[in-house]
């Protein structure tokens, strides 16, 4: 066992040869390197598979031996300072290693097909390999300096991948936004590391925890300064894990390729912030004010992410805000000291969200053949719909991921979510109300995404009832419009169906888009002159096997990964696999491992949470079920006229919520107004001062000297005798002034 741990330092370096060789090959031998593109893909998957096997073996050993292993090498710079670097293997490291490698391998397989058409195929895999290497180095680091080094590398790789299609201005701006936002967090993290080193004199995790505990117990540290340093450490995870108010970069990060969105949201970029808070929890837990701040930021992010997801029309942005909300749940759990539920939720969310993102990528890949390669169209849920019979495997996988994120048993997210909700009830009733309400909102917006994407008919060919071409009828009232509109209060269905026969009614457009090999043509019946008319339309096809295989594997994870946290005894919840694995970390946090609810209380809480989720699904179904089914009941929409004033208030509320969600809570607008525009205004003023004042003085001296020289040259006629006369005159005047001041002293 000890022999195995001694070789753990090699884990981050196993995948590293691929990005290095790819970089050298593309620089020196581009033709040969590109001709072997599939070989590089296979090599990347093979090397990461080795790391996965190694990680699983370490986790199994830790379950049975319950140990923490650390190995450190010291580099002495002088007698007063030495830099130590090494690796740290504990349950948290093992969990993160498995998440990174399993999701990473599936994303690599998926990307081989998804990025096959892209000219930057090899560049993408080079970035991806370096990304996984950086994340592996981060989770195995033994001290804060190493963490910060790999923290920056993870950020750099994410910026490169977010701006992968840098020729698109939107992608380039998203890359810059992610970079600038994370600069704030990274600067805070660096200040916190330096402050903590000034207090303790060490960067090593275990030394830090022990020294800080002793200083607090002996009252030998300024608690205010220690709290400030701890908060600065927390600022880094706030930005990296997209917590309020530094969350604004995450939705725009969807401009990168979809496989990267899956990796960032499941096991790398945003998971890094949760990992660091979990790693530093023994430090934070002895500072109650910091724990409360962590939980407060978490609960705000939970609610904000859920409300901002309500009206998104871009399928990836909707999932991005969902990630933001779920990361808030994890941060809330860590702030409450619920170490095990937080990590359990990190695991279940990683596989469920990776499944959803890869599913959305499969949908986008299929839709591109119909609507073109514009993200505004291929990712727009309002142009989707009716995909169930065209992409059945993708639909099934996406439905399982959606149900998991809704918290429906026995899927993965149900088990971890319930533990956080139970702990929030004990921590704060207000936090519990918000957390439970957000669970219902999660079910609502996730099923909204599912219904708009898969149910009904393909809305690309849909024409609204006014006869004007529109993206979809959903844009009238169901939050999928490109611009703000009020609900039509005078809309009635019966007059529409009893109009003059000379007028034509069609629910589908005449225009079709460019056809590619990834489409099928089908005959569809439309309503035209109240008779039957057959037309041929083109629909998406199911994706290739290399795209479907990773989704099916993630589907299995989503179905069964929750079992690692399910107890198999009736006395308590202390004999599940996850608790057994986390025993060393739980002991380090001095938690009472016997403080668990019984099965009866668990069933009560589970019934309540599932009821909330089902209610959210029911509301989503009522609002977003296919409109065509309501044609069977012609009084459905006309019954709205009986609402009178209540209907008006309801519409105002709907538009208020829509405007809040569609405009991202006005937070981006606030940052743009208060920060971006003010900084630009200040920059313009500084530019004016620099060019007009500073440069003016410098240029003025030069121009004056030039002018005096030219005048002198003109007067003297360029004669040497005149220059000598002026020189002697200046010397004489200088001597007279010196003589005058010298004799004045006497």
Swiss-Prot record:
Molecular-function GO term, any one: NADH dehydrogenase (ubiquinone) activity
UniProt catalytic activity: a plastoquinone + NADH + (n+1) H(+)(in) = a plastoquinol + NAD(+) + n H(+)(out); a plastoquinone + NADPH + (n+1) H(+)(in) = a plastoquinol + NADP(+) + n H(+)(out)
GO biological process terms on file: ATP synthesis coupled electron transport; electron transport coupled proton transport
InterPro entries: NADH_UbQ_OxRdtase_chlpt_su5_C, NADHpl_OxRdtase_5_subgr, ND/Mrp_TM, NU5C-like, Proton_antipo_N
GO terms for cellular component: chloroplast thylakoid membrane
Topology with respect to the bilayer: Multi-pass membrane protein
Transmembrane intervals: 9-29, 40-60, 89-109, 125-145, 147-167, 185-205, 221-241, 258-278, 280-300, 327-347, 354-374, 396-416, 425-445, 547-567, 608-628, 722-742
EC code: 7.1.1.-
Superkingdom: Eukaryota
Cellular compartments annotated: Plastid, Chloroplast thylakoid membrane
The entry's keywords: Chloroplast, Membrane, NAD, NADP, Plastid, Plastoquinone, Quinone, Thylakoid, Translocase, Transmembrane, Transmembrane helix, Transport
Function description: NDH shuttles electrons from NAD(P)H:plastoquinone, via FMN and iron-sulfur (Fe-S) centers, to quinones in the photosynthetic chain and possibly in a chloroplast respiratory chain. The immediate electron acceptor for the enzyme in this species is believed to be plastoquinone. Couples the redox reaction to proton translocation, and thus conserves the redox energy in a proton gradient.
Family: Belongs to the complex I subunit 5 family.
Subunit organization: NDH is composed of at least 16 different subunits, 5 of which are encoded in the nucleus.
PANTHER family membership: NADH-UBIQUINONE OXIDOREDUCTASE CHAIN 5
Entry protein name: NAD(P)H-quinone oxidoreductase subunit 5, chloroplastic
Organism encoding this protein: Draba nemorosa
Name of the coding gene: ndhF
């Amino acid at each position: 066992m000890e022999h195995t741990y001694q070789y753990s330092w090699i884990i981050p370096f196993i995948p590293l040869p691929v990005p290095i060789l790819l970089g050298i090959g593309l620089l020196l031998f581009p033709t040969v390197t590109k001709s072997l593109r599939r070989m590089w893909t296979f090599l990347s998957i093979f090397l990461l598979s080795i790391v996965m096997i190694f990680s699983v073996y370490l986790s199994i050993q830790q379950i049975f031996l319950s140990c923490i292993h650390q190995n450190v090498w010291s580099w002495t710079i002088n007698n007063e300072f030495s830099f130590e670097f090494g690796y740290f293997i504990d349950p948290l490291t093992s969990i993160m290693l498995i998440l990174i490698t399993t999701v990473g391998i599936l994303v690599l397989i998926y990307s081989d097909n998804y990025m096959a058409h892209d000219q930057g195929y090899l560049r993408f895999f080079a970035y991806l390999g370096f990304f996984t290497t950086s994340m592996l180095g981060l989770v195995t680091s033994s001290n804060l300096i190493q963490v910060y080094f790999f923290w920056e590398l993870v950020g750099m790789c994410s910026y490169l991948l977010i701006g992968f299609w840098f020729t698109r201005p939107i992608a380039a701006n998203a890359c810059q936004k992610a970079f600038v936002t994370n600069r704030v967090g990274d600067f805070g993290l660096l200040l916190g590391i330096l402050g903590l080193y000034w207090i303790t004199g060490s960067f090593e995790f275990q030394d830090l925890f022990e020294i800080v505990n002793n200083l607090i117990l002996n009252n030998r540290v300024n608690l205010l300064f220690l709290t400030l340093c701890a908060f600065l450490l927390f600022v880094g995870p706030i930005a990296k894990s997209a917590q309020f108010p530094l969350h604004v970069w995450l939705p725009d990060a969807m401009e990168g390729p979809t496989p990267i969105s899956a990796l960032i949201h499941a096991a790398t970029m945003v998971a890094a912030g949760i990992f660091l808070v979990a790693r530093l929890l023994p430090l934070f837990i002895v500072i109650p004010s910091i724990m409360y701040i962590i939980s407060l930021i978490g609960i705000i992010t939970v609610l904000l992410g859920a409300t901002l997801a309500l009206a998104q029309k871009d399928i990836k942005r909707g999932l991005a805000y969902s990630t933001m909300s779920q990361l808030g749940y994890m941060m809330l759990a860590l702030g409450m000291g619920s170490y095990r539920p937080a990590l359990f939720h990190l695991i279940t969310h990683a596989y469920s969200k990776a499944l959803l993102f890869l599913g959305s990528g499969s949908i986008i890949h299929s839709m591109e053949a119909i609507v073109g390669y514009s993200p505004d169209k291929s990712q727009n849920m309002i142009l989707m719909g009716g995909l169930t019979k065209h992409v059945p495997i993708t639909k099934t996988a996406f439905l399982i991921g959606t149900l998991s994120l809704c918290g429906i048993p026995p899927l993965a997210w149900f088990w971890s979510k319930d533990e956080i909700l139970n702990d929030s009830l004990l921590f704060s009733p207000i936090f519990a109300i918000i957390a439970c309400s957000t669970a219902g909102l999660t079910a609502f917006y996730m099923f909204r995404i599912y219904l708009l994407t898969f149910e009904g008919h393909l809305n690309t060919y849909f024409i609204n009832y006014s006869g004007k071409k529109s993206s979809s009828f959903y844009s009238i009232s169901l939050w999928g419009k490109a611009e703000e509109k009020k609900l039509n209060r005078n809309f009635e269905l019966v007059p529409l169906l009893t109009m003059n026969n000379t007028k034509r009614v069609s629910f589908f457009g005449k225009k079709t888009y460019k056809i590619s090999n990834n489409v099928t043509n089908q005959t569809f019946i439309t309503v035209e002159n109240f008779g039957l008319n057959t037309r041929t339309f083109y629909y998406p096809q199911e994706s290739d096997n290399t795209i479907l295989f990773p989704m099916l594997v993630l589907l299995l994870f989503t179905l069964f990964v929750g079992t690692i946290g399910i107890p198999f005894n009736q006395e308590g919840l202390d004999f599940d696999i996850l608790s057994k694995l986390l025993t060393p970390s739980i002991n380090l946090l001095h938690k009472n491992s016997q403080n668990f609810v019984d099965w009866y209380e668990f069933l009560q809480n589970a019934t309540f949470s599932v009821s909330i989720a089902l209610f959210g699904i029911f509301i989503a179904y009522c609002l977003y079920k296919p409109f065509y089914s309501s044609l069977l009941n012609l009084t459905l929409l006309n019954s709205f006229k009986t609402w009178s004033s209540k209907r008006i208030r309801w519409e105002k509320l709907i538009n208020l919520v829509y405007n809040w969600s569609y405009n991202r809570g006005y937070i981006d607008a606030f940052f743009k107004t208060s920060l971006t525009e003010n900084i630009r205004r200040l920059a313009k003023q500084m530019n004016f001062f620099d060019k007009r004042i500073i440069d003016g003085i410098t240029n003025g001296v030069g121009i004056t000297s030039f002018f005096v020289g030219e005048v002198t040259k003109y007067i003297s006629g360029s004669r040497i005798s005149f220059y000598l006369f002026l020189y002697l005159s200046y010397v004489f005047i200088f001597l007279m002034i010196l003589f005058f001041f010298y004799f004045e002293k006497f």
